[in-house]
């Protein structure tokens, strides 16, 4: 059986490869809460042909390249919900929100692709940390209400 140290070294090598292979996106794949978020941002940027903002920019993670320059917030999760900053912590919600879930096999599923306003109108009560949660089940339900014209078009999956 490999030691924790051996496993961590493997993980750090993977992180180094991710950062090298996706350097154009200027993301750090740190082994903390940012890892899934950074991976999700890169997946979504490539799937929807988006320009990513600097890492850790508040609320806005990317902009569309289609000439409309819409703002996009990207969320990735491995659990059954995602968190958003509560309404009083930002000036304007993003034009679009894309939420994906990533399973342990590394496959991702699109959970929501649509207007930011619809998400922010349906968030739960803010927690003490200023974050509001929404379940993936609720996101899937909201997604059914989003017309194709209000979704970002897939470039590739």
Where are these regions (language model features)?
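Nucleic-acid endonuclease domains
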Residues: 1-157
């Amino acid at each position: 059986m490999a030691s924790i140290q051996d496993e961590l070294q493997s993980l750090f090598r993977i992180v180094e490869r991710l950062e090298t292979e996706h350097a154009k996106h200027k993301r750090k794949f740190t082994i903390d809460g940012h890892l899934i978020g950074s991976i999700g941002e890169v997946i979504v940027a490539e799937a929807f042909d988006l320009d990513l903002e600097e890492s850790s920019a508040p609320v806005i993670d990317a902009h569309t390249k289609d000439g409309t320059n819409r703002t996009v917030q990207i969320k990735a999760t491995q659990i059954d919900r995602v968190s958003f900053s509560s309404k009083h912590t930002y000036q304007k919600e993003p034009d679009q929100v894309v939420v994906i879930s990533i399973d342990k096999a590394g496959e991702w599923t699109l959970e929501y692709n649509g207007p930011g306003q619809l998400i922010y109108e349906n968030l739960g009560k803010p927690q003490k940390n200023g974050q509001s949660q929404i379940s993936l089940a609720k996101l899937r339900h909201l997604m059914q209400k989003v017309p194709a014209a209000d979704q970002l078009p897939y470039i590739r999956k």
